Regions:
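Conserved helicase motor core of P-loop NTPases
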Residues: 293-362, 507-510, 518
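Conserved phosphate/pyrophosphate-binding and hydrolysis machinery centered on Walker-type P-loop NTPases
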Residues: 98-102, 166, 185, 189, ...
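C-terminal helicase module of SF1/SF2 nucleic-acid helicases/translocases
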Residues: 50-58, 282, 324-334, 409, ...
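Amphipathic alpha-helical transducer elements in NTP-driven molecular machines
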Residues: 45-48, 64, 102-106, 217, ...
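Cys/His-rich short segments
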Residues: 326-412
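Accessory, non-ATPase domains that flank or precede helicase/AAA+ motor cores in DNA-metabolism machines
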Residues: 1-310, 317, 331-332, 354, ...
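Conserved RecA-like helicase motor-core motifs
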Residues: 202-212, 361-362, 370, 414-423, ...
Length: 599
């Protein structure tokens, strides 16, 4: 391994001999976000550089880590003299383990640790190859052929690019690649592989992550991968693209809840290059990041599938989720995919008299009944009497059914074999009728021939206990439109709220119909992007929150506990993240979720 030395180290511990090369190392030991200084043996000095992976001795055992800074003692004789005035003897780096993240990613990891209340090692691990890389191939920098007559804004920072759900983003990627080395982030690994094949057919040199990390580190015209690709090395990066920037798969559900959109935008701003956020659902948080560009508005609307809304309030109550329209589809010869989200995100109460779903008067989320005579919001906690807001009936009942039960019912109603798909499904069924959770939408391919997608109970999404429920619901309809190839396909939505702005927006193919109302609601409730949130939970949450309360300046609101969770709301991310950092890194018994997807 060879390479130039990285950044100059300042404020580091000293070494025992003048002129010695000292490496500041961040270890990969879980729970330790502290740097340690080591001398670099002479035979390794020419190869050591910021970002490279090393092995060092720490507390009696050998551990891995990364060099985060390098310096020569002779250039700063005051390096880390101990409080007693002596220079402690430093251990030597035991071994270099190969190429690691570039120096800019080492700096970016420090920012991400502040932004999402985490340790830097987690991000440096994501930025590193899964395998040891000791030798790099030659750079491959031939871009794909440019598309005809497509111009993109080239200013630095975020640019929101609005397209239709069924539009192919490959042409935008190919155009962006003309600027120079390009980093592309896609929601799923399977879609990243498809995009890589298309770009290669267009003559582009592509590194597909994670398998081709070494080529990315050496240099490639286009580097493509899923969420972790936001941390991929991209020497000389000239632009960044995030495809389906609205997709929640860009956000980690596990703490730290970092998202590739935020990392991509920050990375582009630091490099002074454009970051194109391609989306069919430009929600409030995306729009707040930068100006929006729309290509061919008519084509964008045509990318939405034909939407057919089935008002379940007018259906025979005995049919439950199985409307007469659904039964007709099942008894036809069409290939039908049915989506029923049973991940436990929300349980719905509906009026037995008029069929209206009970929801919060304040934030419109679903409500529950924690005690007799009371309805409580699962989102904001607001309470109201146990009556239907539409007809004042007190005959409310739970709506529940799972995918396994639904599969049996669909087989009986349609007389066809029905395949079930969940996140745990390994072998994808070959049935012409499928039922599953959102995992079905993730694994279905536009070439599979399913021209009809049915959402059996879409109200679960519209009323989910999350501040982005409307945006996420619209994103699901966008995904369905892409899978059925836009206007050529059909999306059937069973609902008790056919007038909901999300459904009206999808019907007319104009996301602004729903997202403008969503923006107004967020502004009124001081939700992102007009505020910043963190959700604290875990056995040690109470003590951690007590420490936080002692430090905040009154501009931060702490709500809870509610079911063992605390919600911290701040005017902006700077004040929120500074406060979280002042408390210190959360231990193993505390979970801190910044920008939580679900409350």
């Amino acid at each position: 391994m060879t390479g130039a030395r990285g950044a100059t180290m300042t404020g580091a511990r000293g070494a025992t001999m003048t002129g010695a090369l000292v490496a500041r190392v961040l270890t990969d030991v879980s729970g330790i976000d502290k740097e340690f200084d080591y001398t670099v043996p002479a035979h390794l000095a020419d190869e050591a550089q910021v970002g490279c992976k090393v092995r060092v001795d720490l507390a009696g055992r050998r551990v891995g880590g990364w060099i985060v800074a390098l310096g020569e003692l002779s250039r700063d004789p005051d390096l880390a003299i101990s409080p007693e005035g002596s220079r402690p003897a430093l251990k030597a780096v035991a071994a270099l383990r190969g190429w690691g993240p570039t120096a800019d990613l080492v700096d970016l990891a420090a920012w991400a640790a502040w932004r999402w209340a985490a340790n830097r090692a987690l991000f440096l691990g994501t930025a590193s190859s899964r395998n040891t890389v000791r030798h790099l191939p030659a750079p491959r920098l031939a871009p794909p052929a440019p598309p005809p007559a497509l111009r993109l804004p080239t200013g630095p920072g975020a640019h929101v690019v609005a397209i239709g759900p069924a539009e192919d983003p490959t042409v935008i990627v190919a155009q962006a690649a003309q600027l120079g080395p390009l980093l592309v982030i896609v929601p799923t690994a399977s879609r990243a592989a498809v995009l890589a094949r298309r770009l290669r057919r267009a003559g582009g040199d592509v590194a597909l992550l994670p398998e081709e990390w070494a080529q990315a580190r050496a240099g490639a015209a286009v580097i493509v991968g899923s969420r972790g690709a936001a941390w991929a090395p991209c020497p000389g990066v000239a632009a960044v693209v995030v495809i389906d920037a609205h997709d929640e798969l860009h956000t980690s559900e596990r703490a730290p809840t970092w998202n590739s959109v935020g990392v991509a935008v920050e990375r582009a701003e630091r490099a002074g290059v454009p970051c194109y956020l391609i989306t069919s659902c430009p929600g409030p948080e995306l729009v707040a990041l930068g100006p929006t560009t729309t290509f061919e508005a008519a084509k964008q609307k045509a990318g939405w599938a034909s939407m057919q809304l089935v008002d379940q309030r007018s259906e025979d109550p005995r049919l439950g989720l199985y409307s007469s329209r659904l039964v007709d589809l099942l008894r036809s010869t069409e290939k039908v995919a049915c989506v029923l989200n049973t991940t436990g995100r929300v349980r719905l109460l509906a009026c037995g008299a008029c069929g209206t779903v009970a929801r919060c008067d304040v934030c419109h989320a679903a409500v529950s009944s924690p005690e007799p005579g009371v309805l409580s919001c699962q989102g904001c906690g607001a309470m109201r009497p146990y009556v239907c807001a539409s007809c004042t009936s007190i005959r409310l009942s739970w709506l529940r059914v799972g995918t396994s039960r639904a599969r049996e019912d669909l087989e009986r109603l349609g007389g066809r074999d029905v395949g079930e798909v969940t996140a745990a499904t390994k072998d994808f069924p070959s049935s012409s009728v499928l039922v599953g959770t959102e995992a079905l939408l993730r694994r279905l391919d536009p070439s599979s021939g399913f021209a009809t997608i049915v959402f059996l109970d879409f109200d679960r999404e519209l009323l989910a206990a999350r501040f982005g429920a409307a945006e996420h619901s619209l994103a699901l309809l966008s995904t369905a439109s892409r899978l059925v190839r836009g206007a050529a396909g059909l999306v059937v939505v069973q609902t008790r709220m056919p007038d909901h702005p999300v459904l009206q927006a999808a019907t007319v193919g104009d996301p602004a119909v729903a997202l403008s109302e969503e923006d107004s609601a967020r502004r009124a409730l001081r939700l992102p992007p007009y505020g910043a949130l963190a959700l604290i939970s875990g056995a040690g949450g109470e003590a951690w929150i007590a420490s936080l309360r002692e430090r905040h300046d009154g501009t931060v609101e702490v709500m809870g506990p509610n079911d063992g969770k605390w919600l911290v709301k701040a005017p902006d991310h700077r004040r929120l993240c500074d406060l979280l950092r002042s408390v210190g890194p959360p231990g193993g018994n505390v979970r801190v979720a910044v920008d939580p997807q679900r409350l």
